[in-house]
């Protein structure tokens, strides 16, 4: 049986996410960038909207699993910090994945069912995991668009990097969102 200390220990990690800025925005010179917790909230909200979007189109989606995955998706960064994409590539994506899996397993040791959900997200093989992975990347593009509207420059690489559009082709209709974002940027 879990104890109060188990909950409190996990919450120590969650609270760290409020203090860590998303490193990619710092790398690109964005003034006052969002925290990892800010990002996680936006991803969770977008994932909730995407669940409704896909349900409207006849998909069966387990909303609770999507929401839990969305809330959990960055928990490993409470131990590792947020690694900017170029740093991830330099260190090796597979290596980062192994280390992050270990960190999440340790953080959620008293909550193995949540650790299992995080691993499902990381594997990206279920509709629920894909919705969260896509929400994660769409949120990145939306945040970049918001920063551009507020005067940030030099964010073109974020929009053009294929890693930031990973998994988009695995679910239908996602290009509609990308087209809407590009249109808002003034792209054709």
Question: How would you describe each model-predicted region?
Answer:
Residues 1-188:
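Alpha-helical, largely C-terminal catalytic domains
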């Amino acid at each position: 049986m879990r104890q109060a200390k188990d909950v409190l220990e996990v919450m120590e990690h969650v609270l760290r996410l409020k203090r860590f800025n998303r490193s990619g925005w710092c790398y690109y010179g964005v003034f006052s960038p969002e925290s990892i917790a800010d990002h996680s909230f936006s991803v969770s909200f977008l994932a909730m909207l995407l669940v409704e979007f896909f349900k409207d189109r006849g998909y069966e989606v387990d909303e609770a699993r999507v929401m839990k995955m969305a809330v959990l998706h960055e928990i490993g960064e409470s131990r590792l910090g947020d690694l900017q994409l170029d740093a991830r590539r330099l260190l090796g994506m597979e290596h980062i994945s192994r280390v992050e899996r270990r960190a999440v397993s340790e953080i959620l040791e008293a909550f193995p069912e949540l650790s299992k959900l995080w691993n499902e997200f990381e594997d990206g093989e279920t509709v629920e995991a894909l919705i969260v992975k896509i929400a994660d990347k769409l949120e990145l593009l939306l945040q970049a668009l918001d920063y551009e509207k507020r005067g940030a420059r030099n964010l073109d690489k974020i929009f053009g990097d294929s890693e930031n559009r990973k998994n988009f082709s695995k679910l239908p209709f996602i290009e509609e969102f990308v087209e809407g974002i590009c249109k808002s940027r003034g792209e054709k």
